Curated annotation (Swiss-Prot):
Induction: Expressed in the early phase of the viral replicative cycle.
Classification of source organism: Viruses, Varidnaviria, Bamfordvirae, Nucleocytoviricota, Pokkesviricetes
Domain of life: Viruses
Protein task: Plays a role in virus cell tropism, and may be required for efficient virus replication in macrophages.
The keyword NADP belongs to this UniProt entry's keyword annotation: no
Key words of the record: Early protein
InterPro entries in the record: MGF_505 (IPR004858)
Protein family per UniProt: Belongs to the asfivirus MGF 505 family.
Protein name per the record: Protein MGF 505-4R
Record flagged with keyword Signal: no
Length: 501
């Protein structure tokens, strides 16, 4: 059962000024050698009415003095009992450690709250762990003096390397510097790997400090190492890392900036290309081609084009090839705005490489290209399947076959390319088989075949029309057309056909 006095001590946040030392002692609110003690917040106390300190700090001091009455009071004020252990260690109060230690599951949990290296080490001893555990925790909690104290234990390169890596990853700069200057390390370059990975400029500068003060034994050629660092920084968009590296050597060449292009880091490109001593015009042209391949943003492409003054005569063909190969035509859009039109050669390339119908649709929509032009281009390349897919996408209903039929006939009439005509005539005949034509329309189609010298299609259709009324005189009419058009093969076949009549 709690007494009224206990309840008052726990919940009284403001002690009346009229309370003298005797009353405060009676209430248990007096701290020997310090004065009055009152709670002013959940996490702070007021000592002698003029000093504010945290509850945990007061608990640490009280424990170091062995004052259990004040300890109990502060614990009732929500103090952390970890600070009882810390204070007890500072004051060598092992009776308190014995009393409160049973509440501690793992003494490692307390280490983060300890500022004093000696207390830190004493606390770690309570865990009954080995020296390597102490070193590892000393690194974790930035206790350099503990590492310096136990320097003689750090003799194995592989073990040191592990500790060094931990220090780098934990970003304990003083420890990293001391280890790099003092210990034998298996892979000292790890500091650079971590610096780039964590984007830690301080680690990078420490690494270079160790490297160029001859404290770091690296087998690589320094120029190669610095170039590698420049490439990594360019790929990650870390301009300040590049500038720091350049203080020590290295060269920003095409290979370095190509990494910036691949990852669309425009700020780096602008910074170094503006300083023309780094790159030739040919290098910038090659960077532009790399940007096309890597689907760079419009801003990056425009930046590179601006440094070429939009003059691309030397690489026009290469631009077309890179666009066709990669499938990203953003550069073509930008160039067209500058009156440089590469749309047709690129479209031809896309058709050659049989890009998907959806892709072609998007392309012709972007550049307002008429579908008839695409069909003609595909026909010239003999891409029959592509034409079929394209038409199926555009004309999705079966009723549209008649429309397609008329469209293809019109295209044949305006096409001069022989192979292109043959491709379209094959498709026209396939559609003829799928739709219904009356006698008049059939004769009209036969006449169309004769005019365009489509002998195979003509003969195939004649088999279907052989028994139609008026077919014989119509064949003679077709012969006249073939003679006028000078189609020898067609003439020969019609003459043979007329004999069977």
């Amino acid at each position: 059962m709690f007494s009224l006095q206990d309840i008052c001590r726990k919940h009284l946040f403001q002690v009346p000024d009229a309370f003298d030392e005797y009353i405060l002692q009676a209430l248990g609110l007096y701290w020997e050698k310090h004065g009055s003690l009152q709670r002013i917040r959940k996490d702070a106390v007021f000592v002698q009415r003029n000093l504010t300190i945290s509850t945990n700090e007061a608990l640490r001091i009280a424990a170091s003095e062995g004052n259990e009455r004040v300890i109990n009071l502060l614990l009732s004020w929500e103090g952390n009992f970890h600070y009882v252990i810390i204070g007890a260690l500072e004051g060598n109060r092992y009776d308190l450690i014995h009393k409160y230690g049973s509440q501690i599951k793992d003494y490692h949990m307390i280490l983060s709250s300890i500022q004093n290296a000696n207390t830190f080490e004493k606390c770690h001893e309570l865990s009954n762990c080995d020296m390597w555990c102490l070193i590892d925790n000393a690194i974790k909690y930035n206790m350099l003096s503990i590492l310096q104290k136990h320097r003689n234990f750090l003799t194995e390169e592989l073990e040191n390397q592990e500790f060094f890596e931990t220090a780098c990853e934990e970003q304990k700069y003083d420890i990293v510097l001391w280890m790099g200057q003092t210990l034998l390390l298996d892979e000292p370059k790890f500091i650079f790997d971590t610096a780039f990975k964590m984007v830690d400029f301080s680690l990078l500068t420490i690494g270079y400090s160790l490297l160029f003060d001859n404290k770091m034994d690296i087998q690589d050629d320094l120029t190669s190492l610095l170039t590698e660092h420049l490439e990594i920084a360019a790929a990650k968009g870390q301009l300040y890392f590049m500038l720091e590296t350049l203080k020590h050597g290295g060269d920003v060449n095409f290979e370095v900036l190509s990494k910036a292009v691949e990852n669309d880091h425009r700020k780096i490109l602008d910074y170094f290309i503006r300083r023309q001593q780094y790159l030739s015009r040919e290098d910038i042209e090659n960077l532009l081609l790399s940007a096309i391949t890597n689907c760079a943003s419009k801003k990056t492409l425009n930046l590179l084009l601006s440094y070429l003054n939009y003059s691309i005569k030397n690489i026009t063909e290469k631009i077309v090839q890179h666009v066709i190969k990669g499938g990203d035509y953003t550069i073509i859009i930008l160039l067209k705005k500058k009156k440089i039109n590469l749309v047709e050669p690129v479209l031809t390339g896309f058709i050659d490489h049989y890009y998907g119908n959806c892709f072609i649709e998007n392309f012709i929509r972007e550049f307002a290209i008429r579908p008839e032009k695409v069909i003609k281009m595909a026909a010239r390349k003999g891409k029959l399947n592509m034409i079929i897919e394209f038409l199926n996408e555009k004309y999705v209903h079966k009723d549209d076959l008649g429309t397609i039929f008329k469209l293809l006939k019109n295209l044949v009439c305006t096409m001069k390319h022989k192979k292109g005509k043959e491709t379209l005539l094959i498709l026209i005949h396939e559609i003829y088989r799928a739709i219904h034509l009356d006698t008049k329309e059939k004769f009209k189609l036969l006449r169309f075949y004769v005019m365009h010298d489509a002998t195979i299609q003509f003969l195939s259709m004649c088999k279907d029309c052989f028994n139609l009324a008026g077919f014989k005189p119509f064949v003679l009419e077709c012969l006249d057309i073939a003679i006028k058009k000078n189609h020898p093969n067609m003439i020969e076949n019609i003459e043979i056909l007329s004999k069977y009549e």
